[in-house]
């Protein structure tokens, strides 16, 4: 996959709920000319849960976005790797996203996230993060 990126929930939510960074993320994605988006099955739960809580009128948009994402199963190896990141101070859900991104690191150009701890941890793991802002 030549133009693939791992998408975490903090970024996915900005594609459903209008936030300050939304126009910059949308412009970056347009400049990438149809990037392939990959994420963990965890994104399904996190995104829909957040949309229902914060912006229920965005539910269809969330489903449309998820239809464009290639989802990875949360396998035992990913949970084992994630536990190591939790031990280093990352939250459980972010650790699962990082371990998932690491599992497909040879296929992706980077991790799209707006989570500061995940940006730091992905850098330590050797995965570049993409955080489009002004």
Question: What does each of the following model-derived ranges do?
Answer:
Residues 1-39, 51-61, 126, 133-134:
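Short, well-structured N-terminal submotif of metal-dependent ribonuclease cores
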Residues 2-4, 40, 44, 72, ...:
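Acidic, PIN/NYN-like endoribonuclease modules and their adjacent C-terminal/linker elements
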Residues 8, 94, 115:
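Acidic active-site catalytic centers that drive phospho-/nucleotidyl reactions
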Residues 10-13, 48, 63, 83, ...:
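Amphipathic alpha-helical segments within well-ordered protein domains
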Residues 11-12, 43, 78, 97, ...:
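Alpha-helix capping/helix-boundary segments
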Residues 22, 44, 48, 59-62, ...:
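A general structural signal for well-ordered alpha-helical segments in protein cores
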Residues 67-88, 95-100:
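Acidic catalytic patch
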């Amino acid at each position: 996959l030549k133009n693939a990126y791992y998408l975490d929930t903090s970024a996915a939510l900005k594609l459903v709920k209008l936030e300050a960074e939304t126009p910059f993320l949308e412009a970056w994605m347009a400049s990438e000319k149809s990037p392939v988006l990959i994420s963990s099955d965890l994104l399904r739960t996190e995104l829909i849960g957040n949309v229902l809580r914060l912006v229920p009128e965005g539910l269809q948009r969330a489903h449309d976005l998820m239809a464009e994402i290639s989802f990875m199963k949360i396998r035992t190896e990913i949970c084992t790797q994630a536990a190591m990141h939790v031990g280093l101070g990352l939250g459980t859900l972010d650790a699962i996203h990082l371990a998932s991104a690491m599992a497909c690191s040879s296929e992706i150009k980077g991790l799209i996230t707006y989570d500061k701890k995940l940006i730091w941890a992905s850098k330590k793991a050797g995965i570049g993060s993409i955080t489009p802002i002004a």
